[in-house]
């Protein structure tokens, strides 16, 4: 009952947010297109809240990642033409930022929840969207295709220990030949599970213009 009440309250806040920020988010958009754009954005946020209410540990956050967080993650992508794999894409906030930096054929998006997969396929019909589990990442990677980066929005700290270890192991294996792992977390202090698993942190940055504020880190698995 408590989770349900939180979800309803969040839904009301999202509606208020859409109205209060309408002038800013719709600036430059043709008036005839504004209702559809608002409906699309609110629909994606509502889908996110609904999934959080049903499975809070697997979603990890009440709201989708903000645009500033998504852009910071995309800015950490390494140069080159290798495959970029996104884990836990949700409703596509980070996917959109990655798409602005990476050709569609280089981007592989993995999402476990069916509702989010439907949203992703609707928003990004040109991308490869796979419904799958990050603990089996190796099963979805094309053969003989080097992975330049794994970009993860998975809530590593809230995953059960064995699942967390399996996911981290899959990310390390996928990037073992020179790739990097880009991970964000709402835990602004403390060591990442990736560091505990032996990864070396190369970069990090705080994104204060996100709700809640987040930390983005880039790791190498060797």
Where are these regions (language model features)?
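Active-site capping/gating segments
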Residues: 190-222
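Conserved beta-strand signature within the Rossmann-like core of class I S-adenosyl-L-methionine
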Residues: 178-185
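Conserved SAM-binding loop of SAM-dependent methyltransferases across substrates and taxa
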Residues: 91-103
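Conserved SAM-binding loop
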Residues: 120-121
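A short glycine-rich, Lys/Arg-flanked "PGG" loop and its adjoining helix->strand segment in the class I
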Residues: 165-177
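Conserved SAM/SAH-binding beta-strand->alpha-helix loop
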Residues: 113
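Class I SAM-dependent methyltransferase Rossmann-like catalytic core
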Residues: 41-77
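Conserved class I S-adenosyl-L-methionine
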Residues: 81-90
